[in-house]
């Protein structure tokens, strides 16, 4: 559960940082924020690996039978689709960002110490082709996070089925 909340906070922070930094004029401050954004992306990628390993080795608790029976089939399908797409995007967004950074010729030097390898060649054309995919996938992930939060709030305020309490720290 800790990984869930750390990733949630990190994703909100990096998305906000991404929106903010791209609106700044070219400056040392903007370059610094781009580095922070890259570092956060690498951290999110590492946390996503841990989260996936945890999810594979630790099944989530089953829904209470009454809740399972009351939930329409479309909601179950939406729940599973949203979670699966979020996992895909946990990896896709930072990897696409890494590819964009590599293609643009701006290496990622994690925490200013460890240079990550470029995994695509430097190419202005490739960078221009990759950049919109990073943005679109980030917006897709933000949209799915909003759907995820809205569904949790729906369960709390409309269904009143206690599902949200199961997601809060210390409530299992």
Task: Set out the residue ranges of the language-model regions.
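Membrane-embedded alpha-helical bundles that constitute the cytochrome b-like, heme-associated redox core
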Residues: 1-172
């Amino acid at each position: 559960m800790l990984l869930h909340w750390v990733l949630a906070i990190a994703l909100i922070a990096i998305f906000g940082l991404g929106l903010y930094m791209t609106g700044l004029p070219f400056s040392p401050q903007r370059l610094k924020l781009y580095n922070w954004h890259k570092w956060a992306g690498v951290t999110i990628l590492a946390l996503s690996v841990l989260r996936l390993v945890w999810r594979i080795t630790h099944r989530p608790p089953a829904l209470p039978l009454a809740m399972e029976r009351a939930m329409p089939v479309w909601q179950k399908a939406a729940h599973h689709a949203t979670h699966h797409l979020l996992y895909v995007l946990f990896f896709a967004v930072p990897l696409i960002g890494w590819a964009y950074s590599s293609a643009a010729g701006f290496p990622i030097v994690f925490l200013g110490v460890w240079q990550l390898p470029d995994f695509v060649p430097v190419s202005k054309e490739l960078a221009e082709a990759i950049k919109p995919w990073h943005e679109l996938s980030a917006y897709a992930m933000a949209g799915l996070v909003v759907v995820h939060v809205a569904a949790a709030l729906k369960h709390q305020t409309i269904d009143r089925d206690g599902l949200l309490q199961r997601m809060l720290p210390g409530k299992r």
